[in-house]
Amino acid sequence: MDSQGKKVVVCDNGTGFVKCGYAGSNFPEHIFPALVGRPVIRSTAKVGNIEIKDLMVGDEASELRSMLEVNYPMENGIVRNWDDMKHLWDYTFGPEKLNIDTRDCKILLTEPPMNPTKNREKIVEVMFETYQFSGVYVAIQAVLTLYAQGLLTGVVVDSGDGVTHICPVYEGFSLPHLTRRLDIAGRDITRYLIKLLLLRGYAFNHSADFETVRMMKEKLCYVGYNIEQEQKLALETTVLVESYTLPDGRVIKVGGERFEAPEALFQPHLINVEGVGVAELLFNTIQAADIDTRAEFYKHIVLSGGSTMYPGLPSRLERELKQLYLERVLKGDVEKLSKFKIRIEDPPRRKHMVFLGGAVLADIMKDKDNFWMTRQEYQEKGTRVLEKLGVTVR
């Protein structure tokens, strides 16, 4: 709470999950899937202890997903369906989750870098007009990650469910001209895994199976350090084969797909996306930075978001960066490579890094009124109030 007794809420609305809680806390109060479901057949049945309603949100929708038509209101970090997004916020602030009176609260929201201004304007409009928060602040996700890690300078590789971005931050300021965005993230890898499993003869085609495969991905997938070697293992042995039990009791066997799916992050052409993979994008970003800052950036690469949680990802990233540096900067001179210092930080709680940074920032700002956009300012200026965040509103 701030000095006037107003609660300060932090809400990290991801494409795949909502993480929400309060300023100063060191873990989100609630984490739930950002999905909205509607029953396929109209019925007033109960499944277990959950009643089927016309509109199901979050955890409940996830549990009963086989009976629902499931929608995600956000795609690639941008809100696509505002009505469903409002249902999601109603659920977040309502009795099921935070249970707050939004009129007496301030809220800190997050968004990916390079997001359309229209998206941010609409979010602020909904927060003030529908929920009537007393203050609103919108922070860039990558900067919050660094705050959570206690750094002011570094490069954040943030890969969530909807978008991956590489965002250099110098002395606490994100550098938009160097920020790169890659629209391959967790959701695309889940989709690719579904495709790979289909080739093996397992069909997952209902919107609800998507959640099932996502859970399987989180349990079994990893990033291969040396792809040729992994492929050899997959073809010639059964070391990689794991059994997985589906919710309906069927058991399926998953082998090479375990590393083939996340490989799309490093080789986008596998899922028909043009452009370079995450390692080369990171290398290009740092090399495009000012020559005096590059060494600092190589020493402070911070991973964040659920799609960086694959075992083997940090070491693969380091290997590819060294390889690229050797080829393109040192022109193949191996002796100089020992002087090249690189450090990839993979904090264990990186899945919720953005929320943690938001909780730190909101706690520092809670009584500094000049940081927040207030309801009064919004009533006077409308969406022009965003200029307070240092954003030019056209």
UniProtKB/Swiss-Prot annotation:
Keywords: Actin-binding, ATP-binding, Cell projection, Cytoplasm, Cytoskeleton, Nucleotide-binding, Nucleus
PROSITE patterns the record matches: ACTINS_ACT_LIKE
GO annotation terms (biological process): Arp2/3 complex-mediated actin nucleation; positive regulation of double-strand break repair via homologous recombination; positive regulation of transcription by RNA polymerase II
Pfam families, per database record: Actin
One Gene Ontology term of the molecular function aspect: actin binding
Location in the cell: Cytoplasm, Cytoskeleton; Cell projection; Nucleus
Gene3D superfamilies xref list: 3.30.420.40, Actin, Chain A, domain 4
Annotated binding of ATP, by residue: 160-162, 214-218, 305-310
SUPFAM superfamilies on file: Actin-like ATPase domain (SSF53067)
Spans through the membrane: none
One annotated Gene Ontology cellular component of this protein: Arp2/3 protein complex
Family: Belongs to the actin family. ARP2 subfamily.
Quaternary structure note: Component of the Arp2/3 complex composed of actr2/arp2, actr3/arp3, arpc1 (arpc1a or arpc1b), arpc2, arpc3, arpc4 and arpc5.
Function (record text): ATP-binding component of the Arp2/3 complex, a multiprotein complex that mediates actin polymerization upon stimulation by nucleation-promoting factor (NPF). The Arp2/3 complex mediates the formation of branched actin networks in the cytoplasm, providing the force for cell motility. Seems to contact the pointed end of the daughter actin filament. In addition to its role in the cytoplasmic cytoskeleton, the Arp2/3 complex also promotes actin polymerization in the nucleus, thereby regulating gene transcription and repair of damaged DNA.
Protein name in the entry: Actin-related protein 2-B
